């Protein structure tokens, strides 16, 4: 006797479909010599429509993890985490294979970071955090990751000095150069570098909070008695603050 699948969340499917459609439009603008400005990534300062697509994917992943959590609790121990590790390793491997194909035949210049690698690492960390922590702990971890990321960007721990936030002269690119050497997208760093994992995991955890909220999983004892704080939590979960 088969168990009926839980109903799908239409809002999540709609956001996922819209994000995929937006990705296709951004990656295929029709004429690369004359691209509509919002469909181009910001060179450095500011943000464009194109810059929101990858975070949207990460947010959706967090929502999906929260919705899948009740079903995932049916398995415990290594089998539960084996699926997480397998999916993460598969994503990372796919990203490396694609990068190798682009670098072929000179594999000495292969790019190590990438979009799929970032998604794989983010999924691995977020899925384990969602599986092993409470909602309150996930809020704390998400906030702490943002604070750590901000601190690392402004801390004078490298040759550029404090608050060096120019292309090729900031902590994120300094870390990438130390970790990857020449195996990056550009000599000055990589947009899918190591420090960005912190903000990606934080975004996914905000997505998990949104998923829990949408599923109505918050019990009465965990809800704030302060209307203002409760509203702030809802806005953050919906991605307005986060």
Mark where each language-model region is.
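A conserved active-site cap/scaffold subdomain adjacent to cofactor or substrate pockets
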Residues: 189-219, 226-242
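Divalent metal-coordination and catalytic microenvironments
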Residues: 16, 62, 95, 118, ...
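Long hydrophobic alpha-helical segments that form multi-pass transmembrane helix bundles
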Residues: 135-206
């Amino acid at each position: 006797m088969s168990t009926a699948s839980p109903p799908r969340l239409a809002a999540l499917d709609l956001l996922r479909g819209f994000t995929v459609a937006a990705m296709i439009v951004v990656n295929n603008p029709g004429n690369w010599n004359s691209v509509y400005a919002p469909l181009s990534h910001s060179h450095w300062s500011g943000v464009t429509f194109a810059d929101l697509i990858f975070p949207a994917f990460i947010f959706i992943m967090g929502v999906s993890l929260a919705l899948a959590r009740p079903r995932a609790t049916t398995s415990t121990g290594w089998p539960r985490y084996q699926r997480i590790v397998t999916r993460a390793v598969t994503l990372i491997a796919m990203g490396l294979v694609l990068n190798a194909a682009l670098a072929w035949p000179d594999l000495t210049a292969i790019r190590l970071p990438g979009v799929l690698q970032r998604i794989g690492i983010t999924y691995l960390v977020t899925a384990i955090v969602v599986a092993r922590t409470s909602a309150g702990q996930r809020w704390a971890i998400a906030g702490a990751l943002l604070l750590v990321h901000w601190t690392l960007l402004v801390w004078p721990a490298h040759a550029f000095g404090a608050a060096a936030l120019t292309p090729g002269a900031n902590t994120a690119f300094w870390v990438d150069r130390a970790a990857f050497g020449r195996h990056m997208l550009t000599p000055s760093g990589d947009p899918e570098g190591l420090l960005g994992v912190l903000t990606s995991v934080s975004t996914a955890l905000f997505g998990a909070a949104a998923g829990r909220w949408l599923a109505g999983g918050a019990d009465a004892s965990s809800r704030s008695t302060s209307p203002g704080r409760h509203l702030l939590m809802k806005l953050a979960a919906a991605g307005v603050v986060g």
